Amino acid sequence: MSLLKTLKGQILVLSATCMVAALMVLTLVNYLSARAQAQVSLAEEGMATAKSHAETIEEWARAKATIIAASVAAFEDPEPAKSLAMLRDAGKFSTAYFGYADKKYVFSETRSLPADYDPTARPWYKQAAQAGGSVVTPPYISASDQKLVVTFATPVGAGAALKGVAAGDVYMESVVANVASIQPTPQSFGFLVSADGKIIAHRDQALTLKPIADLSKD
């Protein structure tokens, strides 16, 4: 009888131990599953947020490009500066201008430029002429006010019939602010990178136009 009691007790202890172990395993599995689901949920939320902001930026760029393309109608006006000023104000450009194939140019406001200024030698002119359609330049720091800008440009004519290029500059402040507002979680933040791997918008402004590889150095 004593032996049976001892054996029964051992079995009960073993059973209890197995139950506790099973509960611990189940608890761990549930924890890992919940954590994985939370991580998936955060990833999906982050992707949705990034997509939404990307669509906003794309729409912003599309609207600017459309306005510049429409300005071509005034390209051969006797006094295009008035039309350019209206375009600048309506499209919220910092400046709008025409560069002609004969190297003449007209801006939406009075500009003091070097006597040898040649619009056909400018990157925006060359990029639009080569593309044969509307383009947007890579972001760059404006020499006049040290602000981050991009240029939207559209060629007038093509090839041997190229008459010139219509263009407008836009400050990137609104885009940078939009990206800075991205924060799916308190520990995360958004940043914008160009197609050539340069940082356009980041919470650390010192990284502006730096290679994305610089982030790994921090």
Task: For each feature predicted by the language model, list its residue ranges.
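Long amphipathic alpha-helical coiled-coil rod/stalk domains
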Residues: 30, 38-41, 45, 49
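Solvent-exposed, extracytoplasmic
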Residues: 78-92, 127, 165, 169-210, ...
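Extracytoplasmic/periplasmic sensory segments of membrane signal-transduction proteins
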Residues: 44-137, 182
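Hydrophobic "anchor" residues
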Residues: 104-105, 162, 198-199
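Short, acidic, Ser/Thr-enriched surface-loop or helix-capping motifs
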Residues: 100, 157-158, 194
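Extreme N-terminal signal-anchor transmembrane helix of membrane signaling/transducer proteins, especially
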Residues: 3-36
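Juxtamembrane transmembrane-helix termini
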Residues: 32-39, 177-180
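Extracytoplasmic/periplasmic ligand-binding sensor regions of membrane-associated signaling proteins
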Residues: 107-182, 186-189
